[in-house]
Amino acid sequence: MDVTRFTHPIDLRAVSITDPFWQRETELVRREVIPYQWEALNDRIPGAEKSWCMHNFRLAGRIMAQYRQQGAQYTPQAYTYRGYDALPDDPAHPDEDKFYGFVFQDTDFSKWIEAVGYSLIQHPDEALEATADEAIDVVCAAQTPEGYLDTYYIINGMDGVFQNLRDHHELYCLGHLIEGAVSYYQATGKDKLLRAACRFADYVADFFGTADGQCKGYPGHEIAEMALVRLYEVTKDEKYLRLSRFFINERGQEPNYFVEEERRNAEREHRPVRSVNLAYHQAVKPVREQDEAMGHAVRAVYLYSGMADVARMTGDDSLKSACERLWRNIVQEKLYITGGIGATQIGEAFSYAYDLPNDTAYSETCAAIGLAFFARRMLQMSPQREYGDVMELALYNTVLSGMALDGKSFFYVNPLSVVPSACHADSRLQHVKTVRQKWFGCACCPPNIARIVSSIAAYAFTENEDTLLTHLYLGGSIRKTFPTGTLTLSIASDMPWDGHITVTLHADAPVSGMLGFRLPGWCPNPNVTADKPVRVVDGYAYLSGEWHDGETIVLDFPMPVRLNRANNRVREDMRQVAVTRGPVTFCAEQADNGENLHLLRVDVEDFGKDGEGVQVLPDSRFGHRTVKLLVPGFRQQEDAEGALYAPYQSAAESPCQIELIPYYAWCNRGEGEMRVWLNV
């Protein structure tokens, strides 16, 4: 592996987003989502589930203040098990001296501050920065003198620290703290939170490792692996890279740490040993031997992202090969057409090959975000069209579906078929919400959306010394410094609705360098027009040479409306089709088509080979410009009540136009049915 050719995300300061789509999304996060989520973290959203996040930090800070005041006279609390999700007996009158929420509740803050950092990089805001500084003071006051920082154990008793890595998320909290601290440091230059994150990471590095007396465990919920690599990149302290590599290398080794941990805990708690679902934790075998994505989907893709980071930083071919195998397994057998992953609510997990149900789909928002993390890291090592295609699919569909268009309500799961009456009556669908929620007790998804949307430019563009790669077509300006000078790209784009993109180059003097552009897989006949030769490798068009002020590159990506079928191993989608245009997956909604969407079928003949029979119309009903599709079809006549079964005969049906909207925009007009896969 030639690590010198790998790329890294572009500095957000070098990008200004002006296109109508992503500018709206990033501005929504800046103006609405970040302030709203700060209120949620402080339990000030009427009618929403409480976060308890800042409550816990303030309580932990008071405990640490007592510790500092009393010194040797301080008597620490013996560990009291509070459960995985601790709630007050009387929600209206919570105890001020108790931890509430999930064991990982601290991460609500960490993801919020990460989004704040990205936003401040692009839009300095004194008031927001002051709020963030006050929050950081509260969080840092909770840290122990030794560097440990997890409010669950600081409040409930430190003698339980690192005794339940499988379930209690301390290393997950570390990972998100690092990500947030790095983002805020890069935005403001203020290092208070970064120093706190480093102290916690140092505490962990002393505790874990292969030396005598060190713990050979690893995270139950992965993210520390990629966060530690990021901390290494900022601090240049190789200890953090070594720790990440240790966690990855140790996972799944025999004797299995999680099995041994369970035996120890059962003995200490005087209870029978319970079975450990190693697949759920991606710990069935060492990571380099894994070839199937399994278990909790978010944990899995966070692990794979960390593996890709370590492979990139260390030149580890065996780790890169494992990432490639796991990637292929996901995209060939376990990926929804909306870019979602994790088919089953049982364990929020990947299911078996080709098991992709629509109405019971879990497809967690965080899992799609994690898939985008994984894709971007694979692109950094090896620019291949498929990685960019899947990243784009996840971002434009499941990720954005997770947040309402006003930024104030959210989906945790993202099914591809919803019938509200069924969801309300069927306990098998209890995980499916028919409208977005103001907040969640387990609120991993809302701040996750905020942090990826506010850093979208880092997914669109990566670079190394002499190359700039464009993976997503965001309109705006991008400044790239090559060894011979600085080149600014002005990109005129109306993606995802129009595939005509013009890149105009600006430079004070001639600049030499390479530019690469992804040729999307959804476009059958991409065209690149420029004054330089175009070389296509792995679905990327490369142009290199000396660039002059005013040169243009025109990319034309025709966007036919496509009728898609699933592999016939996907039983749930037999004799059904899904409609896509460009990177956007479309769906039918009750608001446009009435009830009983299962009675609709697409007229495949009139649809046309390239969607000639489909009307593509502008649509401004959702507060910003989108398109809607009018698809030729039929509606079957609804049977009368009475006989449940009858002799077969062709059903009576009448022609109709099926109106489709972008999947991400569904359920912004009230509760109603929705369906992605339509009958034929």
PLM features: residue spans?
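Low-complexity, Ser/Thr/Pro/Gly-enriched N-terminal "stalk/linker" regions
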Residues: M1-D108, D133-Y153
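Solvent-exposed loop and edge beta-strand segments that line ligand/cofactor-binding
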Residues: V3-F6, Y67-Q70, H93-F109, G160-C173, ...
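Structural helix-adjacent loops and short alpha-helical linkers that scaffold large soluble proteins
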Residues: R5, I10-L12, D19, L120-D133, ...
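C-terminal beta-rich recognition modules with glycine/proline-rich loops and embedded aromatic residues
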Residues: A14, S244, C323, D389-N397, ...
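Well-ordered alpha-helical scaffold segments within catalytic/enzyme domains
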Residues: W22, I113-E126, G175-K190, A224-K236, ...
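A conserved hydrophobic secondary-structure block that centers on an alpha-helix together
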Residues: N156-V234
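Beta-strand-rich binding/interaction modules
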Residues: P510-A530
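Solvent-exposed beta-strand/loop surfaces of large extracellular or lumenal domains
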Residues: C523-S544, R562-R569
